[in-house]
């Protein structure tokens, strides 16, 4: 029988070191379950020996707390089946009664912006006007119908499944979209679903990402979008595309700062001190996370020129920016280690009572 620990289910080793350091600093035993095509499911078969990429469905999973941080962009790193592997592992863990943070229902949110949009809209949040288009053939005609409701207004496309700004482009006309769809540059969504959304203007060229751990506020991050990139991943390991690429513009970008004019030495991520745990939107989001049993998340919103607070993304495999971590009195990774370590201690106390 293995020693109870926190098991982290993921597919990208490059994102793990800050978390590993946090678990070590908090003296929380941790193990990785790396679900890639060439990896096993170490520790899940009830002992400390790595398996060969399989699980015995009749065996009990190793004791401990399981935290899923599978990424919707796994396929961009050559891990096309990682999400399916995770579905299988999470189902096995949940049927066995193990404690799983960000379980199967959260994975389905991570891999579907359609699901995120529906959940946020049903909860009463202001969300972007969105049409989901299945396949490539109807994309242009769907855009014609979409733009007819807001003539002359620009719009964006994005992939239903995937982070890192996958498939996100701004178009001023349907004709521009038609040319893109017929060009070699067209990015086919991994699940075949492309979203059409209103292009929203922010009061200033930034968006805000609020980090939550254990469903509670950690800090809010100001993300400068003046350089024009849709790549908002805060981790050092994320590859940020060249600012100002033709056809792209970041959420909230305005003419006051043209693409490519952002200070090259300035980190686009910084603490937003005016957004605290007492902010009305933060309190609503905490209630939303509790209602939907989402333990760890980064949620993004923008403040628009017409006075709206538009919530547009739920990221359940959140990464933390080093520059933000260096200036924040609270650490995201340490908060996770403390939260999961607390769950582990509580579970062990029940077992030994």
Language-model regions, residue ranges each:
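Short hydrophobic segments within beta-strands
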Residues: 8-9, 213
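Active-site nucleotide/adenylate-binding loops and adjacent lid/helix of ATP-dependent enzymes
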Residues: 2, 97, 105-205, 248, ...
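Phosphate-binding site of ATP-dependent enzymes
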Residues: 166-289
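A short acidic, helix-capping loop that chelates divalent metal ions and anchors anionic groups
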Residues: 73-77, 164-167, 322-323
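Short glycine-rich anion-binding loops that position phosphate/pyrophosphate groups of nucleotides
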Residues: 71-74, 160-162, 317
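Conserved N-proximal alpha/beta basic substrate-recognition cap immediately N-terminal to
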Residues: 11-134
């Amino acid at each position: 029988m293995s020693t109870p620990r926190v098991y982290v289910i993921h597919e990208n080793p490059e994102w793990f070191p800050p978390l590993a350091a946090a678990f070590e600093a908090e003296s929380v035993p941790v193990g990785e379950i790396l679900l890639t095509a060439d990896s096993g499911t170490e520790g899940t078969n009830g002992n400390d020996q790595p398996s060969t990429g399989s699980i015995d469905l009749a065996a009990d999973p190793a004791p401990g707390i399981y935290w899923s941080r599978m990424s919707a962009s796994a396929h961009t790193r050559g891990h096309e089946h990682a999400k399916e592997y995770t579905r299988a592992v999470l189902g096995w863990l949940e049927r066995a009664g193990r404690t799983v943070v960000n379980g199967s229902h959260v994975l389905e949110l991570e891999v579907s912006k359609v699901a995120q949009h529906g959940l946020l809209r049903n909860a009463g949040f202001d969300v972007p006007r969105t049409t989901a288009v299945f396949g490539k053939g109807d994309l242009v005609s769907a855009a014609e119908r979409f733009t007819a409701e807001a003539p002359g207004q620009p719009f964006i496309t994005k992939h239903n499944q995937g982070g890192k700004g996958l498939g996100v482009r701004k178009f001023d006309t349907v004709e521009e979209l038609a040319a893109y769809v017929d060009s070699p540059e067209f990015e086919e969504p991994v699940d075949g679903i492309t979203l059409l959304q209103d292009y929203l203007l922010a009061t200033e060229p930034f968006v805000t990402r609020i980090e939550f751990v254990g469903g509670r506020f950690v800090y809010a991050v100001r993300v400068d979008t003046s350089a024009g990139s849709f790549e908002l991943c805060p981790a050092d390991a994320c590859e940020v595309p060249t600012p100002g690429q033709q056809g792209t513009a970041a959420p909230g970008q305005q003419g006051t700062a043209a693409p490519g004019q952002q200070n090259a030495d300035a980190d686009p991520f910084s603490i937003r001190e005016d957004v605290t745990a007492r902010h009305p939107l933060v309190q609503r989001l905490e209630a939303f996370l509790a209602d939907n049993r989402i333990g760890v998340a980064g949620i993004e919103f923008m403040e628009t020129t017409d006075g709206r607070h538009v919530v547009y993304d739920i990221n359940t495999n959140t990464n933390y920016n080093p520059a933000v971590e260096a200036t924040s009195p609270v650490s995201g990774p340490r908060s996770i280690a403390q939260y999961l370590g607390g769950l582990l201690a509580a579970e062990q106390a029940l077992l030994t009572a």
